[in-house]
Swiss-Prot record:
Pfam families: Hist_rich_Ca-bd (PF10529). GO terms for biological process: muscle contraction; positive regulation of heart contraction; positive regulation of heart rate; positive regulation of relaxation of cardiac muscle; regulation of calcium ion transmembrane transport; regulation of cardiac muscle contraction by regulation of the release of sequestered calcium ion; regulation of cell communication by electrical coupling involved in cardiac conduction; regulation of cytosolic calcium ion concentration. It is found in: Sarcoplasmic reticulum lumen. Residues 55-89, 324-335, 444-463, 470-481, 504-515 have a biased composition (Basic and acidic residues). Residues 148-158, 173-183, 231-241, 288-298, 336-347 have a biased composition (Basic residues). Sequence repeats lie at residues 106-121, 134-154, 155-177, 180-213, 214-237, 238-270, 271-294, 295-318, 319-342, 343-365. The modification Phosphothreonine is found at T76. May play a role in the regulation of calcium sequestration or release in the SR of skeletal and cardiac muscle. Residues 106-342 are annotated as: 6 X approximate tandem repeats. This is Sarcoplasmic reticulum histidine-rich calcium-binding protein. Keywords: Calcium, Phosphoprotein, Repeat, Sarcoplasmic reticulum, Signal. Residues 1-28 form the signal peptide.
Length: 699
């Protein structure tokens, strides 16, 4: 490595000069402009470094798709054969100390190589104007931290922009990014290969900038051991390091998806692929168990520390793919115990990121969704237990140990997040086991069910996760309760609440039935009241008819008296009508009703005066006779006991209510309307005649 030092220092100095020459306004413009352009400066040698650095600042390293093999050679050209040189660990420690403290307030520790310390400051100035706000390294990082906070907060990834800057970054970040030490390349590669190498290095930086979205096979056990030390102290700085040889192969595959790589860059390694060793994950677990806000970045023995650091830091690794072993899962479980609520990587959630990271970041439940199906049965069993306690979190875990760790952690840290996003397979299995309804969901929604009958159950099930079948009937809920008897020991309160809710629902139904009965009773009472009203109306009509007949009688009496011949004819007619009487309905005597309604009190007061003789005397009128409507004639006996004058009868004769008609008693009741009198027969015959006239047209 020693013969490459002049190259490194020269490139660093040139990059610093280029960054100083550019004014701040240019850097601000570059923030808006420079995304998405490719670096097409294929110059070679040290002489063109300044031009390349300036072009680097204009064209940020995103999507260099056209040069598939450039990164490989640049990494080896600049002499960063990390896998072939024995001095690599020392430089790793130096650079890790130099650049490992990128957060504001993190003091960069001592640098064994002074030139590298200077290069860190210069490169930071160079990187200051980039659109992503990817911070450089060194002491100036804390000064411009406010400038770059609106860019990826706490993701102070080390940008690698141009070929020259790639060379500079190869020295600065050769422990963060260009760790793809391709063993087959020597530091003495031809300069003719530099063009391809540099642009591919930029491409590699873009994918490495991508927080190792696709972390592939082949991380060794030694790398993992070093990761343990590296991750103990990595904070939100999240160094985005490179990978081994396979990463370059992936870069070739991902040339067409560079923009996707950039989105995946901040996607926090949604897809971490196969082949991570057991020790790597154990070390990662140690690293993440000790994450403090202080994030003191200590020296790293190997570049692999940073590599695993990024993979696990941005890990939350929503989809860590197959062949991860149980120890890896346990280790990363420790990582997420302390890190899940803290890593909210804002501003870089593409649609793909939402799909990949949604289960990871916002639901914080299954960080290990796509593990091998080896432990799928255990996973299902644990899921049933977890759904019994806190189904809202929906934590389909891959392994028992991981699940146990998550239980305590999520009970405390993420109590209020209802994580409904569960993989489809697990959804089906869990829905079958839990009887289509999780108990904890019932607890949360049974209060709504109270007093609403079956509507409460429907509202309740509307909040269930997609794997759970909506239950619409209370009878179905009871079936579910029979299926969930296995979980009564773990969650007895939910079943008790189910019983209470069912009882309350039954009470609601009983109340509904009672209400119906009350309504029916009211209807019946209303029917009775209608009958009474009808009777009252009939009485009123009869009273009106009586008044009309009385007026007619008076007019008849005042008019010409009838001849005896005419009276005889009327009697004959009446006899003939009496024969036909069965055809007619006999009109009840209105005197009886009058006696019942208004004359009861007066009769009682009159005592012996109103005896049965009077009833017989005034009750034997002919049917239909007007005298039958002379209700006052029944009160004539009361007039004897009434000592009031005619002038003031209404005022003083309170007991004699009908005394105002007492003067009519000797004139009408005793003479005209006596039973069997002329008026009695005449009026009855007239009534019958009218009845015949009305009845005959109908047939």
């Amino acid at each position: 490595m020693g013969h490459h030092r002049p190259w490194l220092h020269a490139s660093v100095l040139w990059a610093g000069v280029a960054s100083l020459l550019l004014p701040p306004a240019m850097t601000q413009q570059l923030r808006g402009d420079g995304l998405g352009f490719r670096n097409r400066n294929n110059s070679t040698g040290v002489a063109g470094l300044s031009e390349e650095a300036s072009a680097e600042l204009r064209h940020h390293l995103h999507s260099p798709r056209d040069h598939p093999d450039e990164n490989k050679d640049v990494s080896t050209e600049n002499g960063h054969h990390f896998w072939s040189h024995p001095d690599r660990e020392k430089e790793d420690e130096d650079v890790s100390k130099e650049y490992g403290h990128l957060l504001p307030g993190h003091r960069s520790q001592d640098h064994k190589v002074g030139d590298e310390g200077v290069s860190g400051e210069e490169v930071f100035a160079e990187h200051g104007g980039q659109a992503r706000g990817h911070r450089g390294h060194g002491s100036e990082d804390t000064e411009d931290s406010a400038e770059h906070r609106h860019h990826l907060p706490s993701h102070r990834s080390h940008s690698h922009q141009d070929e020259d800057e790639d060379e500079v970054v190869s020295s600065e970040h050769h422990h963060h990014i260009l760790r793809h030490g391709h063993r087959g390349h020597d530091g003495e590669d031809d300069e003719g290969e530099e063009e391809e190498e540099e642009e591919e290095e930029e491409e590699e930086a873009s994918t490495e900038y991508g927080h190792q979205a696709h972390r592939h096979r082949g991380h060794g056990s030694e790398e993992d051991e070093d990761v343990s030390d590296g991750h103990h102290h990595h904070g939100p700085s999240h160094r985005h390091q490179g990978h081994e040889e396979d990463d370059d192969d992936d870069d070739d595959d991902d040339d067409d998806d560079d923009d996707d790589d950039v989105s995946i860059e901040y996607r926090h390694q949604a897809h971490r692929h196969q082949g991570h060793g057991i020790e790597e994950d154990e070390d990662v677990s140690d690293g993440h168990h000790h994450r403090d806000p202080s994030h003191r970045h200590r020296s790293h023995e190997e570049d692999d520390n940073d590599d695993d650091d990024v993979s696990t830091e941005y890990g939350h690794q929503a989809h860590r793919h197959q062949d991860h072993r149980k120890e890896e899962v346990e280790a990363v479980s420790g990582e997420h115990h302390h890190h899940v609520p803290d890593h909210r990587h804002q501003g870089h959630r593409d649609e793909e990121e939402d799909e990949d990271v949604s289960t990871e970041r916002w639901h914080q439940g299954p960080q290990h969704v796509h593990h091998g199906l080896v432990d799928e049965e255990e996973e299902e069993e644990e899921i049933t237990v977890q759904f019994g306690h806190y189904v809202a979190s929906h934590q389909p875990r891959g392994h028992k140990s991981d699940e146990e760790d998550f239980q305590d952690e999520y009970k405390t840290e993420v109590p209020h997040h209802h994580h409904h996003r569960v993989p489809r397979e697990e959804d089906e299995e869990v829905s079958a086991e839990l009887g289509h309804q999780a108990p904890s969901h019932r607890q949360s929604h049974q209060d709504e069910e109270t007093g609403h009958g079956q509507r409460g159950s429907i509202k309740e099930m509307s909040h269930h996760p997609p794997g759970h079948t909506v239950v619409k009937d209370r009878s179905h809920l009871r079936k579910d309760d029979s299926e969930e008897e296995k979980e009564k020991e773990e969650d007895p309160g939910s079943h008790e609440e189910d019983d209470e809710s069912s009882e309350q629902g039954e009470k609601g139904t009983h109340h509904g039935s009672r209400d119906q009965e009350d309504e029916e009773d009211e209807e019946e009472g209303h029917g009775l009241s209608l009958n009474q009203e009808e009777e009252e109306e009939e009485d009123k009509e009869e009273e009106e008819e009586e008044e009309d007949e009385e007026r007619r009688e008076e007019r008849a009496e005042v008019g010409a008296p009838l001849s005896p011949d005419h009276s005889e004819e009327e009697e004959e007619e009446e006899e003939g009508l009496e024969e036909d009487e069965p055809r007619f309905t006999i009109i009840p005597n209105p005197l009886d009703r009058r006696e019942e309604a208004g004359g009861a009190s007066s009769e009682e007061e009159s005592g012996e005066d109103t005896g049965p003789q009077d009833a017989q005397e005034y009750g034997n009128y002919q049917p239909g006779s007007l005298c039958g409507y002379c209700s006052f004639c029944n009160r004539c006996t009361e007039c004897e006991s009434c000592h009031c004058d005619e002038e003031n009868m209404g005022e003083h004769c309170d007991q004699c209510q009908h005394c105002q008609f007492c003067y009519l008693c000797p004139l009408v009741c005793e003479t005209v309307c006596a039973p069997g009198s002329y008026v009695d027969y005449f009026s009855s015959s007239l009534y019958q005649a009218l009845a015949d006239m009305l009845e005959t047209p109908e047939p």
